[in-house]
Design a protein with these regions (language model features):
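Alpha-helical structural segments
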Residues: 14, 18-25, 43, 60-83, ...
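Helix-turn-helix
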Residues: 18, 26, 30-60, 64
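Hydrophobic alpha-helical connector segments
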Residues: 64, 78-107, 129, 157-164
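N-terminal hydrophobic signal/anchor transmembrane helix of membrane proteins
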Residues: 73, 88-109, 194-215
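Amphipathic alpha-helical segments used for helix-helix packing
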Residues: 103-125, 179-184
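A contiguous binding-surface segment within folded domains or other stable secondary-structure elements
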Residues: 112-148
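C-terminal peripheral helix-coil segments that are non-catalytic and often amphipathic
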Residues: 136-151, 167-215
Length: 215
């Protein structure tokens, strides 16, 4: 492997992008449990030792991928919610929110792995930086949502998104089990466990928002 140290800012950014791209590709192909830092380094054509110049661990790499995915999600939500400004159209709002969320399986899978995997092998500094970014994105999505559904109110919308993120994050892995489990829950005897992710997320979001509006 021929490796040259990146010195200029654009070279450093390119090296980071190569590492992130390699990690994202491996994640989509194998899932996070099967991806090692060695595999990421090999895919990015960089030595494992030099990966540490850019990221402190495998988990730090995936935290950055998740941060970027959430930013894309929020930016797109701002765009698609803008036409609903002042409408108080709960059905249209939930449809837009859920459909945009469902379209981002990488983000959903990484969110599901956040507490049990991604936050386990990183420094406090990395966690703080990640959480600060997420707080900024939360403010943006709350603002866009309040513009679309002003009757819910700022506090009500905060409660809704707290519910939404936590419910979505827990629901995704429950509705995307391992293949052998999926075969079993598809049997009539176990239909109770066979839930559709989008429909369940949509239905529960409608219930919560209507409840907030009824207060």
């Amino acid at each position: 492997m021929v490796w040259k140290r990146a010195r200029r800012p654009e070279q450093i950014e390119q090296r980071r992008a190569d590492i992130l791209g390699a990690a994202a590709d491996l994640f989509e192909a194998k899932g996070i449990e099967s991806v090692s830092l060695t595999a990421i380094a090999c895919r990015a054509k960089i030595s494992k030792a030099n990966v540490y110049r850019y990221f402190e661990s495998r988990e730090a790499i995936y935290l950055e991928i998740l941060r970027a995915e959430v930013e894309l999600w929020v930016t797109e939500l701002e765009r698609i919610l803008a036409p609903l400004a002042g409408s108080d159209d709960v059905h249209a709002f939930v449809t837009a929110l859920v459909d945009e969320s469902v379209s981002r399986p990488k983000m959903l899978a990484l969110m599901a792995a956040l507490p049990s995997v991604l936050e386990r092998n990183v420094s406090g500094e990395v966690i703080r930086e990640f959480k600060r970014s997420i707080l900024g994105f939360a403010l943006r999505i709350n603002n866009a949502s309040n513009v679309a559904l002003p009757s819910v109110g700022i506090e009500g919308m905060h409660h809704f998104h707290t519910f939404y993120i936590n419910f979505m994050t827990g629901l995704y892995p429950a509705t995307h089990p391992a293949p052998h489990v999926a075969e079993i829950v598809a049997e009539p005897e176990f239909s109770f466990f066979n839930r559709d992710f989008r429909q369940t997320l949509f239905d529960q979001s409608m219930v919560v928002l209507r409840g907030l509006l009824a207060k």
